[in-house]
Amino acid sequence: MADMPSVEPTRIDPKLLELLVCPLTKGRLEYDSARQELISRSAKLAYPIRDGIPIMLPEEARPLAD
């Protein structure tokens, strides 16, 4: 059986993270490297990062549990 290549998590440039805001609340975002998401606590949404690109569309975001 062939070994599967390991997928290294994407790293977000800290300067980019300073510039990005939640499109709904304009609040700051937190980077969750384990889940590859940008978290908006104010909107209670987690925006996915796919292939190193943050998907900042509310309809693509995952609702956060309370």
Swiss-Prot record:
Any one Gene Ontology cellular component term annotated for this protein: cytosol
A Pfam family recorded for this sequence: Trm112p
Stretch forming the signal peptide: none
Family per record: Belongs to the UPF0434 family.
Protein name: UPF0434 protein Mnod_1613
Taxonomic source organism: Methylobacterium nodulans (strain LMG 21967 / CNCM I-2342 / ORS 2060)
